[in-house]
């Protein structure tokens, strides 16, 4: 009969799938990688399915437990926040060095529009080709995303009740 050896404590010469084999190249304090056959070979190529979540429906203030007990100031603030995006805001275009200058620099736009509309309007006023680039910056500080709301930008970054949009044909900042 074979006696158990330190490498094979079970005393048999067949490998035991439940106990990892320790080889000279593998450290004893690291776990062995188990080699188990996949039950379904199709699971490797199929992507993880997306969760099917329905869109959250907006909740009226009367249906909400939290919003129905807010103080009057909060109700007024919510109404003011909704009202800002219904009016018009003033946009002032400022050319950066080497940018063409507009004859009229001040325009009004609906607060509910996206910043993309401002960029398209500016491109039209500057007679840009499809291949020309226009870089726009709010207050000469940052370039907002095209999907940003003009009303939100105006509310947060207005100067003298105007949204200052600097523009250039080449990248001006960072």
Swiss-Prot record:
One of its GO terms (biological process) is piecemeal microautophagy of the nucleus. InterPro entries: Atg12, Ubiquitin-like_domsf. Signal peptide: none annotated. It holds the Pfam family APG12. GO terms for molecular function: Atg8-family ligase activity. It comes from the Eukaryota. Its main location: membrane. There is a cross-link at residue 174 (Glycyl lysine isopeptide (Gly-Lys) (interchain with K-163 in atg5)). It is found in: Preautophagosomal structure membrane. It is a peripheral membrane protein. Ubiquitin-like protein involved in cytoplasm to vacuole transport (Cvt), autophagy vesicles formation, mitophagy, and nucleophagy. Conjugation with atg5 through a ubiquitin-like conjugating system involving also atg7 as an E1-like activating enzyme and atg10 as an E2-like conjugating enzyme, is essential for its function. The atg12-atg5 conjugate functions as an E3-like enzyme which is required for lipidation of atg8 and atg8 association to the vesicle membranes. Belongs to the ATG12 family. Forms a conjugate with atg5. This is Ubiquitin-like protein ATG12. It comes from Neosartorya fischeri (strain ATCC 1020 / DSM 3700 / CBS 544.65 / FGSC A1164 / JCM 1740 / NRRL 181 / WB 181). The lineage of its organism: Eukaryota, Fungi, Dikarya, Ascomycota, Pezizomycotina.
